[in-house]
Design a protein with these regions (language model features):
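Solvent-exposed edge beta-strands and adjacent loop segments
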Residues: 1-32, 187-201
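Short, surface-exposed secondary-structure edge patches
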Residues: 47-52, 131, 283-287
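Short beta-strand and beta-hairpin "edge-sheet" elements
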Residues: 58-86, 164-166, 294-317, 322
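Cys-His-centered catalytic/binding microenvironment captured across papain-like cysteine peptidases
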Residues: 90-92, 105-111, 331-347
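Oligomerization/assembly interface segments of phage tail-like spikes and tubes
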Residues: 27-45, 80-91, 210, 267-268, ...
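Surface-exposed cap/loop segments at beta↔alpha junctions
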Residues: 46-127
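Acidic, small/polar-enriched beta strand-loop surface segments
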Residues: 2-5, 180-319, 331-332, 343-347
């Protein structure tokens, strides 16, 4: 296993952590929500220097990623002294920056990220990976006047994005484009007995209409189909044979000047499947990474579909202990829904 390092706040001292409770050591990641490390450390003759280095705002470094100690509990059992720590990924220290200025108008995701970091980058860098030009410009009103983390979360919500930090370098992807289809599968009664998931069809739609670029002299006060460079195109999913016609909000995107290109885009945008989200505890370890798309087979409900890994809890010090996996094929995970409710004061 890779070493766990404890580093002081000034980053001038660093020690390897030994004699920690291996059962307690876990790393938990939830897409766009949390990434943290926790461990219990008893003080021993062999780790006294490192033990004393464990303190609030000092760092834990593991697997190339840096975490800031945000929670710590010191306690004793008889003569034995312990520290329980929770260290949050260094990305979340971005909340300490604030952009007071606001911007409004039609903005791209790059425009808004540039605006945030105009107030100072605080050691962070960023890039947007969008080779298929999925990100569209959005109308913004008074974007700003908040801390960096809240502003980034607003971007993730508005643009349908996911952020994957590599320490202080932030990579933004369209949520529909990131992650790899794997050969792994999670099958009920094969590699998991513990399955908890929800299925809902509130957002299921079977038809969508797309409008492309307007002609130069189009009358925008009374638009007609003939005002577009190609007639608006309608895509109807084969799922309509089962569920009937359920119409999704139309797409309006002036980037499109070719009808067939718009048709392909509509196929990507139509939400013609049930939303599935849940969690599983595996019987043994699988090699799964953030965003991987894994075949989930649940015979009792005849469910066989690719679902994305949106949360992983691993136990690196116990090689044979299986990870806990959170799966979802929705744009919003359960944790993000709860977080939104909390922000609105509804829970």
């Amino acid at each position: 296993m890779k070493n766990i390092l404890i580093r002081n706040y000034e980053e001038t001292k660093e020690e390897i952590l030994i004699n920690y409770d291996k059962d307690s050591f876990s790393v938990s990641w939830q897409q766009n929500e949390t990434w943290e490390l926790s461990v219990t450390v008893p003080r021993t003759k062999g780790n006294q220097i490192t033990f004393d280095l464990i303190d609030y705002e000092n760092y834990v470094v593991f697997d190339g990623q840096q975490y800031s100690i945000k929670q710590m509990r010191s306690y004793a059992s008889g003569s034995q002294i312990y520290k329980d720590i929770v260290a949050t990924h260094i990305y979340y220290t971005i909340q300490d920056g604030r952009q007071y200025d606001t911007v409004s108008g039609t903005k791209s995701i790059n425009d808004l990220l540039t605006h945030i970091f105009k107030a100072g980058n605080r050691g962070f860098s960023w890039e947007v990976v969008d080779p298929n030009n999925v990100f569209l410009k959005k109308e913004q009103e008074n974007f700003g006047n908040d801390n960096y983390l809240n502003l980034i979360n607003e971007i993730l919500e508005d643009y349908g994005a996911v952020v994957i930090p590599n320490n202080k370098h932030l990579i933004f992807y369209p949520i529909s484009e990131y992650g790899n289809i794997t050969e792994q599968q999670i099958r009920y009664k094969y590699n998991t007995d513990e399955v908890s998931f929800d299925i809902d069809t509130y957002a299921l739609k079977t038809q969508i209409k797309g409008y492309g670029k307007l002609k130069e002299n189009a009358n925008t006060d009374n638009l007609k189909d003939s005002d577009y460079v190609f007639p608006p195109v309608t895509y109807t999913s084969a799922e309509s044979e089962k569920w009937g016609i359920r119409i999704q909000d139309p797409v309006e995107d002036e980037r499109y000047t070719i009808q067939n290109n718009m048709l392909e885009y509509l196929k990507q945008q139509l939400h013609d499947y049930p939303d599935v989200s849940g969690s599983v505890t595996l019987k043994w370890a699988l090699s799964l990474n953030k965003g991987d798309k894994v075949l989930f087979v649940y015979e009792p409900l005849s469910l066989s579909t690719y679902i994305q890994v949106v949360g992983i809890t691993t136990y690196p010090a116990i090689p044979n202990k299986a990870p806990e996996i959170v799966l979802s094929n929705t744009k919003k995970t359960i944790t993000s829904i709860l977080a939104n409710l909390a922000r609105k004061g509804l829970m």
